[in-house]
Amino acid sequence: MRPLIIAHRGASHLAPENTLTAFRLAKTLGADGFECDVQITRDRHLVVAHDYLTDLKTGVHGNIPDMDFDDLRQLDFGKWKSPEFAGEKIPTLEEVLEVAQDFRMIHIELKPYLDRDEEIVDRVIDAVLDAGLEEKAVLTSFEYGALR
């Protein structure tokens, strides 16, 4: 038996990290699973993005936990990587979990923010259970308090 191959933020060397395109490409390239980062928006949507700040990936200043989902969805999360990815949108956790159905494993890193630690843990667990991925999912966080 060989070790599992996990694509960090999807096939992020070829596509914009933490996007549906990157996750689908990881499958095409033969990955067994992928790692993604989950944050919660001001209006309590679960979105997949590593950085809190949108500046680097979109060219628009913003802090994901302080933004509403509809505003985030208007931003382009792809063109920073290459013009061919222009128009790539920030995915919701639910969209990413749908893609994860085709993989053996999904590694979800929780990005806690201020008073939302407990909420993000509970909401991510519920989403994983709703998607039927409890046997494939691993949850991690750099914030120990979020995992208690």
Language model segments and positions:
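Phosphate-group recognition and catalysis centered on beta-loop-alpha active-site segments
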Residues: 1-148
